[in-house]
Amino acid sequence: MGPAEQRHAMDTLMIGALSLETSRLALQRSRRPLVRQFAEFEAEESTTVAQVIAEMTGMAPPPLRPVERRLVERLARANGPAFDREYLVGQITAHRQILDVQERYLSAGRNMHHRHLAMLARGRIREHLRELDLLQRSRV
């Protein structure tokens, strides 16, 4: 595995770990059914992507860095609509970052398996960004 593949895997795992942690929190704390549904799907997908990367590379998600841990702690202190707002904003930020990771790899990476993962992930991430935009606008 070359440097581009290592970076692709690690960046995907790192962002996915934060998304998973905040989505688990949203499953417990959100009062909005559609936000909880999104969080459930996101948690399942983040877990699956981490499993795929582990099988491809032997790499596991890293522990959250201090800055990410502080984001989770801040989210955990929020309640009600403020919680949902913070969660959705965080998910949009994370999805934009992970989309950039996939596009960066697709522009230069050559490993077929990583390219396939990046192609599949890119489509789902774009869908998630549209869903997150709708969730931000709705009150359900």
PLM feature segments, named:
Residues 1-140:
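His/Met- and acidic-residue-enriched segments that coordinate or traffic transition-metal cofactors
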